[in-house]
Amino acid sequence: MSNFPDNKILIATHNNGKLEEFKQILKDLDLLILSSKDLNLDEPKETEDTFIGNARLKSRTSCNKSKLPCLGDDSGLEVHALGNQPGVYTADWAYTKNGRDFNQAMNRVWNELLKSKQKEPFTANFVCTLVLTFPNGNEKIFEGRASGKITWPIRGIGGHGYDPIFIPDGYNKTFGEMSDLEKNKISHRNKALKKFISFYNDYNN
């Protein structure tokens, strides 16, 4: 039977911004939330070509090493005018020899849109896929999406990644201009984690 020993769950990430988002959304659960960084676990390279493939890779690898239930996450930005790029390569677009530079990545998105000769609005989705792996091999999958559009120039300093160029549907400000609390209510990661919360609550009732 799958369970949560000692009410612990491992989040397979070294990304502090992502981890804080997880903790904020899951704060009402009776769970001790640990990260790969807390346990000194290396992050596997994202070698798959789908969100679910990369999330599963991270979840299984970290679960096998820690012997704890583990949530692996892969998320990204799909810009429709760019054929859903950067997609699973969202983080790669920010890669530099000195680490990730998301200002560079956001500039690349906008420059690619200008080269595409397509007209605004430049619709896009943020996608989050979560894979929950238990030490016995059982697995659950949760997905969330946030629809919106790309804007320029960069707006706001909040959030992380591409947040300052993404305006969610129904709003006139970017994720980067929102408070963490406001963003977390509508984000793709929130929608995926709400599905996990429903699973967790059903499991414990």
Regions found by a protein language model. Name each.
Residues 2-10, 16-205:
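Anionic-ligand binding patches
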